[in-house]
């Protein structure tokens, strides 16, 4: 499997197994791309129970005082696992949208993508310990909607910093050391 085939499996896959499969050794993409770069995609492929929730309003996460309850903790982990899966899908999308980006940039995205896959698997394991299955609660596609229209690698990096990373800082207050 080459890098593009791996990215396609993640973006278009309809199972978590496809999206979270470790690629093993990837071959280099051929010099000539077999298809034009992906220009736009409304939503990534997803299992039915993880398709983005439609409609207005935000998804509720458990309040801080409820996190001593395993089910509530699992619900918060579910919310965060969706962030990690979205990050995985968006990294794969970058590889498909910008096949001519500098090799070092693409390599960095590929490494980060694999880290995001592992983070998703870790959240899923911990959620299961809390009695929650991934797909049990509705999920948001807001980050996909915000970042998918990117027009360049720099656009991606900028938008990622202003959305994902900033949003994750917002959840830092839930962590008590």
Please annotate each region the language model reported.
Residues 1-82, 97-101:
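Terminal targeting/low-complexity segments that flank the catalytic cores of oxidoreductases
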Residues 5-12, 18, 93, 111, ...:
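Charged/polar, solvent-exposed surface patches and flexible loops
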Residues 57-77, 99-104, 138-164:
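Acidic/His metal-coordination segments adjacent to aromatic residues that form catalytic metal sites
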Residues 80-83, 112, 160-164, 168:
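Amphipathic alpha-helix face/heptad-repeat signature
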Residues 81-145:
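Long, hydrophobic, well-ordered secondary-structure blocks that form the structural core
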Residues 172:
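Alpha-helical phosphate/pyrophosphate-handling elements in metalloenzyme active cores
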Residues 175-177:
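Conserved small/polar residues in nucleotide/adenosyl-binding loops
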């Amino acid at each position: 499997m080459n890098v593009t085939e791996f990215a396609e499996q993640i973006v278009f896959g309809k199972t978590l197994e496809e999206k979270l499969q470790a690629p093993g050794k990837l071959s280099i993409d051929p010099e000539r791309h077999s298809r034009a770069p992906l220009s736009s995609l409304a939503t990534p492929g997803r299992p039915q129970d993880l398709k983005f929730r439609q409609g207005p309003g935000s998804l509720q996460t458990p309040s801080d005082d409820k996190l001593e309850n395993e089910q509530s903790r699992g619900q918060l982990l579910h919310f965060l696992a969706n962030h990690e899966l979205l990050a995985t899908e968006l990294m794969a999308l970058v590889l498909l949208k910008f096949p001519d980006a500098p090799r070092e940039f693409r390599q960095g995205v590929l490494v980060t993508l694999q880290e995001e896959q592992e983070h998703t698997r870790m959240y899923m394991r911990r959620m299961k310990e809390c009695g929650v299955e991934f797909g049990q609660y509705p999920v948001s596609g807001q980050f996909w909607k915000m970042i998918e229209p990117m027009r360049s690698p720099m656009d991606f990096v900028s938008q990622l910093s202003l959305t994902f990373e900033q949003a994750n800082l917002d959840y830092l207050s839930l962590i008590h050391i």
